[in-house]
A protein has these predicted regions:
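Cytochrome P450
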Residues: 1-404
Length: 404
């Protein structure tokens, strides 16, 4: 008798689906690598090589109708919703500030911020690692790069959290969003604070991203706001998600934490990439089909939406040995957590730096931590980012002192 494969419930725009999607991901990769979602009327692509194939063929799979499912963002001017050559032209405006060499110049600043964070946390003996650790570092670093005043970092964090999480809470085709007012309020606050900064940078430019955009003669304020929000969300929220998840997962996998303590060089070689593959903070992105064609025997038509399932692709056994296990010694692979091709995450090198420095200092200063309540950490239901709302931890209060 042949094995009967259970067909899971798959709704690619249901936030609840992404709380624990891994059984469904396995089924999709094995049985329906190009899956038609009959509820949401779009395609899901789950295998690693297929995600890369879509990401690297912008002619056939366009970003110009928007990067989020069922939302027409063709009028938005952010680079994430553009195809080449327009996308590359806009990206090139700030790309020099995100090269590996440019990012390395920020390491001392990032370490100073991490030290400041841990100086506050370590004496407490317990904390919510999401609020006290994970959310602070990227909000401060990205806020500084953009040009927000340092005392505005909590606003930066709140804007990114609300926009990323609230906009992914409910299917756009489902009932009216119960959170519309909170999302609108966050956007109004972001606009009210940012527009005066843009006007100030036009009068007196500084060494920050707002100045780079504000002084472009062909850019209006709306375009500057679009790009600012993109960098703020991508830079603050995804790094927060990765750090928070890894604090939790290293508490549950002490053997992996011991490896990092015994071989700290792993954070320089393999561990950070494995963290990012394992967490895959961004759940999906959308592309729009520009011409009729077939993929794995399925007929895709012009205008169809395709959702790239990064978390499924990053656990594809066709690419990774034992992909369902966290292995900080894993040889570097081509994970797609940052996307791939032309739209590869602009801030990837900065995210890697922040994650590496955070865990170098965290493991040095408070090497032993445990979950305060193993049942507490909960994934926030979302169709965009897979993040924990809270990760309570406990740790000894006689830590290694900060670096002098």
């Amino acid at each position: 008798m042949s094995d009967v494969v259970a067909v899971p419930r798959v709704n690619l725009l249901d936030p609840a689906f992404y709380v624990d999607p891994f059984d469904a991901y396995r089924w999709l990769r094995d049985e329906a690598p190009v899956f038609w979602d009959p509820v949401q009327h779009l395609w899901g692509v789950s295998r690693h090589d297929d995600v890369i194939a879509v990401e690297t063929n912008g002619r056939r799979y366009s970003s110009a109708k928007g990067s989020r499912p069922h939302l027409d963002l063709s009028r938005e001017q952010s680079m994430i919703n553009l195809d080449d050559p327009d996308h590359q032209t806009q990206r090139n405006v700030v790309a020099p500030r995100f090269t590996p060499r440019a990012v390395r110049t920020h390491e001392e600043h990032v370490r100073d911020v991490v030290t400041e964070i841990l100086d506050r946390v370590v004496p407490l003996g317990e904390c919510d690692a999401v609020e006290a650790i994970a959310s602070r570092l990227p909000a401060i670093v990205v806020g500084d790069l953009l040009g927000y005043p340092r005392d505005a970092w909590e606003q930066v964090r709140d804007w990114s959290e609300k926009v990323m999480h609230l906009s992914g809470q409910t299917s756009p085709t489902g009932p009216p969003h119960v959170f519309d007012r909170a999302l609108l309020q966050a956007m109004e606050e972001f606009t009210a604070v940012t527009i005066p900064l843009v006007e100030d940078r036009r009068r007196a430019p500084r060494d920050d991203l707002l100045s780079v955009w504000a002084t472009r003669p062909d850019w209006d304020t709306a375009r500057v706001l679009d790009e600012t929000l993109l960098v703020l969300n991508g830079g603050a929220e995804t790094t927060r998600t990765a750090i928070g998840a890894m604090i939790r997962d290293l508490a549950l996998r002490p053997e992996q934490r011991r490896l990092l303590l015994e071989r700290p060089n792993l954070l320089q070689t393999s561990a950070v990439e494995e963290f990012i593959r394992w967490v895959s903070p961004v759940l999906n992105m959308r592309r729009t089909v520009t011409e009729d064609h077939e993929l794995h025997g399925e007929s895709l038509r012009e205008g169809d939406e395709v959702v790239l399932l990064y978390g499924a692709a990053n656990r594809d056994p066709r690419v990774y040995d034992d992909p369902e296990q966290l292995d900080v010694t894993r040889a570097h692979g081509r994970h797609v957590a940052f996307g791939f091709g032309a739209h590869f995450c602009l801030g990837a090198h900065l995210a890697r730096l922040e994650i590496r420095v955070m865990f170098e200092e965290l493991l040095r200063r408070m090497p032993e931590w445990e979950l305060a309540d193993p049942d507490e950490p909960r994934i926030v239901p979302s169709t965009f980012a897979r993040a924990y709302d809270r990760v309570g931890i406990r740790f000894p209060t006689d830590p290694t002192p900060a670096r002098s």
